[in-house]
């Protein structure tokens, strides 16, 4: 063997050793390592080095030609492998026989490409994070607040809480709280918001449905309490109709519900009048005087009189008698307390023309 032949063998050994070093440096499985070594061995052993019997100069020329062609062939294969990797071909698409030792570095190249693609993707995501202008945010706040309020109202009206209520009645003397509530026409199915917004209308229902109520107001306390304040007309006396007693209110109206004699109060005033217009006028006039004087009247009669058609006779509980025209009750009867304190025997106090008294 010549010196050039030994150099060829040494170059082949160096290639194999380089391949072995690359395999050891890569973290691949033993099976893959054996496969790559077999391929390179096949490439290295498939090329037979011809034995030459020609002179040394001819052998050197032939060897140089063979070496140049072999290096060109290897360079061509390397370029083909690199192009296949760039075009995204997988290892399965490349025949096992055409793989070279450069396949060992494709994993590193792919990892590098993956890192580059992730970096580019991250940069794209960062570029998409655009700051929203403050003007847009301030314009969106009213819309969001309105939407939230509407949603809250919708949930409130759907829930049973919107109809759950507590009703209290204040100022009632003869009427019960249940009666006042029924007169208001407030229904359990009515929304609390509806009652609060139309409180005046419900209060008018009480006055309309009950002649005993003088004033009525409804006040709302959060969250669901309604207080009904009423003032009842004073009862100035009672009239008897067909063995039934009816209260006469200070408004001039006659109560609609009859009362038995056993249910009458101890100090009640009996009104012996039949004309409804006179009864109404009498009730209005008596409603203007002091309640103490009004409670001191036992009976009210209308005796016939040629001089004064509306002259009334008041029989007082202390035994005195008062004569007074119906149209002047609120003006003259207020003096009765002072006059009654001055007499010691039953006395008739005549207020028809002026005011004077004489013993009964």
Swiss-Prot record:
Gene Ontology annotations of biological process type: FtsZ-dependent cytokinesis
Annotated Basic and acidic residues bias: 31-44
Extracellular-side segments: 161-360
Ranges of biased composition (kind: Polar residues): 17-28
Disulphide bridges: none
GO cellular component terms given for this protein: cell division site; plasma membrane
Compartments where found: Cell membrane
Transmembrane segments: 140-160
This protein's UniProt keywords: Cell cycle, Cell division, Cell membrane, Membrane, Transmembrane, Transmembrane helix
Entry membrane topology: Single-pass type II membrane protein
Domain of life according to the entry: Bacteria
Residues in POTRA domain copies: 162-233
Residues covered by region (Disordered): 1-54
Positions on the Cytoplasmic side per record topology: 1-139
PANTHER family named among the record's database cross-references: CELL DIVISION PROTEIN DIVIB (PTHR37820), CELL DIVISION PROTEIN FTSQ (PTHR37820:SF1)
Family in the record: Belongs to the FtsQ/DivIB family. DivIB subfamily.
Chain's role: Cell division protein that may be involved in stabilizing or promoting the assembly of the division complex.
Protein's name in the database: Cell division protein DivIB
Name of the gene: divIB
